[in-house]
Every structure is written in C-alpha cells, then in structure tokens.
Amino acid sequence: LYQPSYISLESALSFHGIITGFPYTVTSVTPRKTRAYLISGKEYGYTHLSPKWFWGYEKKEAFLMAGPEKAILDYLYLAFKGLRPAAIDEFDLSTIDRDMLKDYLGKMADQRFLRFTQRLKL
C-alpha cells in the first residue's frame, strides 16, 4: 500500500511469536512520512524509521517482513523515541538469536539507543 515499507513492530512481533495476540492494525515501518490507512475495515499503520535503518527484512509471499531480531529493535527504537511503551517484559525472547541481535545493535550505531537497550537488559 505504502512503499517502501516492511511489516514490523507489533505485527512482526506477533508473527514471530514474541508477543501474544495479533494487533488490530497491521504495523509497518517506512523511510517516508508516518501514515495510516483504513481499507475494507482493516487498519494499516506506517511509522517513519530512518532510511539508514531500513534493513533486516525478508520477503514473505507478497510482502516484506522484519526478522524477529530486527522487529524487536524497530519496536525498541520507537520506545526509545517515546512512540511505544518499553514493555519488553511481555516479550518471549526464548527463540531470539542473541548474536544477531548484538550484531544488529552494532549496525544501528547509535550510542544513546545502545545504552537504552542495555538498561532494559536486552
């Protein structure tokens, strides 16, 4: 609907089994402006994410979706910016590749965000 974008945040976290339930809104990130659409009773939300962090996704059928580690970091980055609650105590992190998560954190190269994730004991 709104390109370029990939499914991430709550929708990807739910898909990967990191959170329970499925959000009402299909949540995606985009390097473009934040937008929302209501189509046939379904809400699609697109949240701006810096173009330099527009990676870590893969093709799933006809759409792009963040891998589990990138979905966590996308969500936490928005929490860091005050746009989401930092409620990772509700996340099931048992299947997460911790080495990949650390690599991705290094790739994001934002020291304030890194300190934020360290305080969360990610």
Whereabouts are the PLM-identified features?
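Nucleic-acid-binding surface
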Residues: 1-122
